[in-house]
Amino acid sequence: RATDERINQAEQELRSELVVHVAVQGTADIGSVLGFTLLLKKVERIGDQAKNILELAEQGVSFADSSERERLFAERQELSALFAEAAELLNASDADDEAIAEYTDRANISVAYYQSKIDEFMTSERPGHEVVPLAIYYRFLRRIGANLVGIVRTSVDPLPHVDYLDDGATDTDD
């Protein structure tokens, strides 16, 4: 929990520095500052979801003996790859709109898959002690994936479309 407190403190300091920047430098950078603030919030959300997964494990939830263990491991690897690719896109010196669009499409496929698993478990005939933890786990994965997409998209388009999906619908996947 000490690490969590240090991270929260660092996030608060970053937000404070962004506010001070606007106060000192004026409003010329307000769009970028708001974009960075939104980006930081999405990163915080991913951290919160990761903590939620840890708390599942701390509460005794284990998929080690699950018949779905291999698939869960493969999905974890895929999500890890999305993290790595997001980092590459964020570290690129120039925004590559095509690469970002391809990333967004692939990540959204994963997000939709996670939702399909949630839907499947919600109507499953399997015992609740099996499917409830899986549904909760997939909900956390879905939110992590959606926020990864949000981070990458916010990095290139900080304000005009934040919290809206491509079709104009509101993105409520916090």
Question: Each PLM stretch: what is its role?
Answer:
Residues 1-174:
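Cytosolic, long alpha-helical scaffolding segments
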